[in-house]
A protein has these predicted regions:
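Acidic, divalent-metal-binding catalytic cores of TOPRIM
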Residues: 162, 178-210, 219
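RNase H-like polynucleotidyl transferase catalytic core
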Residues: 164-170, 210-222
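A charged alpha-helical hairpin associated with nucleic-acid processing machineries
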Residues: 99, 141-144, 215-219, 231-253
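Short, surface-exposed acidic/glycine-rich loop or hinge patches that mediate macromolecular interfaces
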Residues: 151, 170, 193-194, 218
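Phosphate-handling DNA/RNA-contact segment within nucleic-acid enzymes
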Residues: 62-185, 199-200
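Short, surface-exposed amphipathic charged segments that create phosphate/polyanion-binding patches used
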Residues: 179-183, 222-236
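Non-catalytic accessory segments of DNA primases and related replication-initiation nucleases
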Residues: 1-83, 91, 103, 113, ...
């Protein structure tokens, strides 16, 4: 039996707490990476997340011990360069999954110039997939969803209990929009910048009838990730719960 949506939220809540203790200070992240390597993430709740693969720490030696050179699936996931270099070394890793929960690519995060590295997987297409597709195959699948741009935006909303999918960018597509049919209502939250505002004003995500875009005017808050840096999580949750009671196409919070 697969994980229920509530169990999934609990895992993401543990992941959220872990990541937010780091901030984006490179020295702090480096220390945490060393601690993870030395102590294998002591928290039992985070261990649960590791086991489910919703937030995973992988070292190259562990993968090499799996015989990745001979393993077709690992090669097709694009985990290693042709020279055998582990592409996501010293990064925190988020798996991209299909709606059955199969890992189809990995995204490695670290607060450097690159921020995110996605493995060149044979199974992955950003044009066709959201980050968070595994939610569609869960028990008690939610009847509504939020759509955001970034994977951290999604992580934070799911940690509060809100179902959410991430575009992994700004661009929508017919393939992604076909997923809307799984839900009764969709709430789009593009970033609070020039491009994001255009997405809302011109409906570039083609949200279905009865759905809404959510926005705010505070220019110091660019996205959901920023919102969590400026406000308490429970306050954000309360504001969003009030927002989803409204029926307007554009909802200001």
């Amino acid at each position: 039996m697969g994980m229920s949506y509530q169990e999934y939220v609990e895992v993401y809540n543990a992941v959220f707490r872990k990541i937010k203790t780091l901030g984006e200070n490179e020295d702090e992240v480096r220390r945490e990476i060393k601690r993870a390597r030395d102590y294998d993430l002591e928290s039992s709740v985070v261990d649960k997340a590791l086991n489910y693969g919703d937030f995973i720490w992988v070292e190259s030696e562990k993968l090499k011990g799996m015989g990745w050179e001979e393993n077709k699936k690992l090669r097709e996931l694009g985990l290693f360069s042709e020279a055998g270099r582990w592409l996501l070394e010293d990064r925190f890793i988020f798996p991209v999954k299909d709606m059955l929960g199969n890992v189809i690519a990995l995204i490695g995060w670290y607060p450097d110039d690159k921020k995110y590295i996605t493995t060149p997987s044979a199974y992955f297409s950003k044009k066709c997939l959201f980050f968070g597709m595994e939610m569609l195959g869960m028990q008690n699948r939610p009847k509504v969803t939020f759509i955001v741009e970034g994977i951290f935006d999604r992580l934070m909303l799911v940690a509060l209990g809100f179902p959410c999918l991430a575009e992994m960018g700004i661009t929508s597509s017919a393939e992604k929009e076909s997923i809307y049919g799984f839900f009764k209502r969709v709430y789009g939250i593009p970033d609070n910048d020039k491009v994001g505002r255009r997405v809302m004003n011109e409906d570039e995500w083609n949200l279905p009838r009865g759905s809404s875009y959510i926005f705010w005017e505070d220019s110091s808050v660019k996205d959901i990730d920023d919102m969590f840096k400026n406000y308490e999580p429970e306050s954000i949750k309360d504001v969003l719960l009030e927002a989803v009671k409204q029926k307007e196409r554009k909802i200001e919070i």
